[in-house]
């Protein structure tokens, strides 16, 4: 990752947005493959990738169990995710002939669709209430598709966009960086894994054994950053069951590996070929750089993923403004 590609934290200059800001309901803007150029030149893309890289830097070399600041906004976001988790318990899967895509997910999703703005309003202070409808759209986009009952990296990106928007309106601040990943995103992953297991959700746009993972990407990026300069855990260790079982509570990357091995059968090299290849990379910093490049190429620059991304006033489609 070239230093020049780093963006400043999106919250650095916009901790308190102007009261005159016109919030809008985000909508799709990428309708055809040629529109992808608009996305890559957009303020939204610059702010989104800047946010991902800022957090990547923030968690470098730190364990999940590291002692970090937890603000009231972080606690409220965790409570929001706890609510989504509770709704899963209240919405058990239904008996149906098809093994995958349990229709009870639609009941769960309908509740979120109805309550999303109320949930976001518990996190956003009243003087920023005008931002709630815009920000809530990203939360609704972050948990899968209720028609197809699937989940993939586009939904994960919507959750990162949701957090990025909360930074841009000043709800989350620069010193929340570690907690955004270790507390909020980690809890989000737990809830998404529970959704995937409970309702047997299909992977959206999965590349099968040639993809990195059926459902997630960001925890591999941030998780590899956590492991940079680790005194003894090297990339080759993540395919070692003992190393994973002993260290997964400290490292997001190893939690992802544990989940894959719980969900899939057979040799690791066969069901997760891409990850198996990554285990041969000599250092975590090289893994981290490679995953950032791969994320851009396989997720952010792929029309089937980005066609669903929504743009509003906080993540706008207009070209990057300098300064």
From Swiss-Prot:
Family to which this protein belongs: Belongs to the PTPA-type PPIase family.
Residues annotated as binding ATP: 148, 153-154, 304, 307-308
Enzyme Commission no: 5.2.1.8
Region called Disordered, residue ranges: 1-22
A GO term for molecular function: protein phosphatase regulator activity
Gene Ontology cellular component annotations, sorted alphabetically: ATPase complex; calcium channel complex; cytoplasm; nucleoplasm; protein phosphatase type 2A complex
UniProt modified residues of type N-acetylalanine: 2
Predominant cellular place of this UniProt entry's protein: cytoplasm
tRNA-binding found in the keyword field: no
InterPro entries from the UniProt entry: Phstyr_phstse_ac, PTPA_C_lid, PTPA_sf
Name recorded for this polypeptide: Serine/threonine-protein phosphatase 2A activator
Subcellular compartments: Cytoplasm; Nucleus
Function field: PPIases accelerate the folding of proteins. It catalyzes the cis-trans isomerization of proline imidic peptide bonds in oligopeptides. Acts as a regulatory subunit for serine/threonine-protein phosphatase 2A (PP2A). Modulates PP2A activity or substrate specificity, probably by inducing a conformational change in the catalytic subunit, a proposed direct target of the PPIase. Can reactivate inactive phosphatase PP2A-phosphatase methylesterase complexes (PP2A(i)) in presence of ATP and Mg(2+).
Pfam families named in the record: PTPA
Keyword vocabulary terms for this entry: Acetylation, ATP-binding, Cytoplasm, Isomerase, Magnesium, Metal-binding, Nucleotide-binding, Nucleus, Rotamase
List of residues binding Mg(2+): 208, 214
SUPFAM superfamilies per the UniProt record, alphabetical: PTPA-like
Catalysed reaction equations from the record: [protein]-peptidylproline (omega=180) = [protein]-peptidylproline (omega=0)
Quaternary structure and partners: Associates with PP2A heterodimeric core enzyme PP2A(D), composed of a 36 kDa catalytic subunit (subunit C) and a 65 kDa constant regulatory subunit (PR65 or subunit A). Interacts with the catalytic subunit PPP2CA (via C-terminus). Interacts with PPP2CB.
Domain of life: Eukaryota
Lineage of source species: Eukaryota, Metazoa, Chordata, Craniata, Vertebrata
Listed GO biological process terms: positive regulation of apoptotic process
């Amino acid at each position: 990752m070239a230093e020049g590609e780093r963006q400043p934290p999106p919250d650095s200059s916009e901790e308190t947005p102007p009261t005159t800001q016109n919030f809008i309901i985000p909508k799709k803007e990428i309708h055809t493959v040629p529109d992808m150029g608009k996305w890559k030149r957009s303020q939204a893309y610059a702010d989104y990738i800047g946010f991902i890289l800022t957090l990547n830097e923030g968690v470098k070399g730190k364990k999940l169990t590291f002692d970090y600041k937890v603000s009231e906004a972080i606690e409220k976001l965790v409570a929001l995710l706890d609510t989504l988790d509770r709704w899963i318990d209240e919405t058990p899967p239904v008996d149906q002939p098809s093994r995958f895509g349990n229709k009870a997910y639609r009941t769960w999703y309908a509740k979120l669709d109805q309550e999303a703005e109320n949930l976001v309003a518990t996190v956003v202070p009243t003087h920023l209430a005008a931002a709630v409808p815009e920000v809530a759209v990203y939360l609704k986009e972050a948990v899968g598709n209720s028609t197809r009952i699937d989940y993939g990296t586009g939904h994960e990106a919507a959750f990162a966009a949701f957090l990025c928007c909360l930074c841009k309106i000043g709800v989350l601040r620069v010193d929340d960086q570690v907690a955004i990943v270790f507390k909020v995103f980690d809890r989000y992953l737990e809830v998404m894994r529970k959704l995937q297991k409970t309702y047997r959700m299909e992977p959206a746009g999965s590349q099968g054994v040639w993809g990195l993972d059926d459902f997630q990407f960001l925890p591999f990026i941030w998780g590899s950053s956590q492991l940079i300069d680790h005194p003894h855990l090297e990339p080759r260790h993540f395919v070692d069951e003992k190393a994973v079982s002993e260290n997964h509570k400290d490292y997001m990357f190893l939690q992802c590996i544990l989940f894959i091995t719980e969900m899939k059968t057979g040799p690791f090299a066969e069901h997760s070929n891409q990850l198996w290849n990554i285990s041969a990379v000599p250092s975590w910093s090289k893994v981290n750089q490679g995953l950032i490049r791969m994320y851009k190429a396989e997720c952010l620059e792929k029309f089937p993923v980005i066609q669903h991304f929504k743009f509003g006033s906080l993540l706008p489609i207009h070209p990057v403004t300098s300064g």
